[in-house]
């Protein structure tokens, strides 16, 4: 049996552990490309131990910025995108990756908060430590998601009781709301979490899974992106039930097709990735047009220095290095 845990609106929930006035109101965390590292101001920074989308590698202790200081640029324009938002904000149509400007237009009373990556990193590590004390095998899938393999450790008829125990322990010790999905295999447990949100638990047995998933749209399954979704719809495959009916087609696509079919059907999807192998490391920043070549060189040197810190912390020895520059009109140089 597998348990998948996903912290609800993690960045918002993390901020609410510090400020209870944020409860039950529309809240969003907004991010923008942080160019503080180019500043001559002395700020203590650390390297993040978590690696995930919308999570900065460079953590600054200078996080107490106002809305004006963080989101409004020198020309008075509101900058940044929504990295996560509360369910109260989602009712107004606010979504992840939406511009802060658009989010405020949809929800004028939206409470915008600059990110505090040090806090998120700390809470994620605390959750991992908690789970490692309660579960034999865990995989950290992202900064706010974990898989737990409890096969042979928790009986199936006791799995719901154990999930409630974990949920209460996480709330009591970390003050974080969490959604939990339970299934016989890894990726089906992740799918179940979508039906546990917000702040719930969803368990479907292997016997009932085909019926439960037959009408679920293919785009709801982890690993089916936009391009693959369009490809599958070209074969008139629109639901997970359609995937189950087309074994020969998926097996003809070799490994990628076989893996997807098996994940959807709950076949041989029972291995956790305890430690992920890093294939690349990088750091980058976006900023307004700079006409001074010396300033551009200075910024490249600063980024290179931070990259060297990350490489040292990860204890790796890269075989190659590259610099990628994207210009104002989409022209690239490497």
Model-derived segments and spans:
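Catalytic palm subdomain of template-directed nucleic-acid polymerases
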Residues: 148-167, 236
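Short Gly/Ser/Thr- and Asp/Glu-enriched loop/turn motifs at secondary-structure junctions
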Residues: 141-145, 183-186, 316-320
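Residues that scaffold, gate, or flank divalent-cation-dependent active/transport sites
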Residues: 1-143, 147, 257
């Amino acid at each position: 049996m597998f348990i998948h845990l996903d912290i609800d609106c993690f960045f918002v929930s993390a901020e609410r552990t510090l400020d209870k006035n944020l409860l039950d109101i529309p809240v969003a965390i907004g991010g923008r490309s942080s160019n503080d590292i180019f500043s001559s101001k002395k700020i203590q920074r650390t390297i993040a131990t978590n690696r995930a989308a919308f999570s900065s590698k460079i953590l600054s202790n200078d996080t107490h910025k106002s809305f004006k200081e963080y989101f409004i640029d020198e020309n008075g324009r509101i900058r940044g995108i929504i990295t996560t938002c509360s369910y109260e904000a989602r009712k107004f149509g606010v979504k992840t990756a939406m511009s802060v400007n658009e989010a405020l237009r949809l929800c004028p009373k939206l409470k915008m908060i600059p990110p505090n990556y040090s806090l998120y990193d700390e809470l994620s590590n605390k959750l991992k430590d908690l789970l490692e004390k309660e579960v034999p095998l865990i995989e950290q899938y992202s900064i706010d998601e974990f898989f737990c393999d409890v096969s042979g450790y928790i009986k199936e008829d006791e799995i719901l009781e154990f999930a409630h125990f974990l949920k209460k322990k996480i709330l009591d010790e970390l003050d974080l709301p969490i959604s939990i999905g339970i299934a016989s295999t890894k990726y089906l447990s992740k799918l179940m979490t979508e039906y546990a949100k917000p702040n719930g638990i969803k368990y479907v047995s292997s016997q009932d899974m085909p019926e439960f998933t037959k009408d679920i749209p293919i785009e709801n399954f982890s690993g089916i992106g936009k391009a693959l979704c369009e490809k599958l719809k070209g074969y008139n495959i629109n639901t997970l039930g359609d995937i189950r009916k087309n074994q020969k087609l998926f097996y003809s696509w070799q490994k990628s097709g076989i893996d997807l079919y098996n994940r959807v059907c709950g076949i041989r999807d029972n291995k956790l990735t305890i430690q992920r192998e890093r294939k690349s490391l990088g750091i980058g920043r976006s900023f307004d047009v700079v006409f001074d070549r010396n300033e551009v060189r200075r910024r490249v040197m600063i980024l290179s220095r931070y990259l060297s810190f990350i490489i040292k912390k990860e204890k790796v020895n890269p075989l190659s290095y590259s610099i990628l520059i994207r210009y104002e009109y989409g022209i690239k140089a490497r």
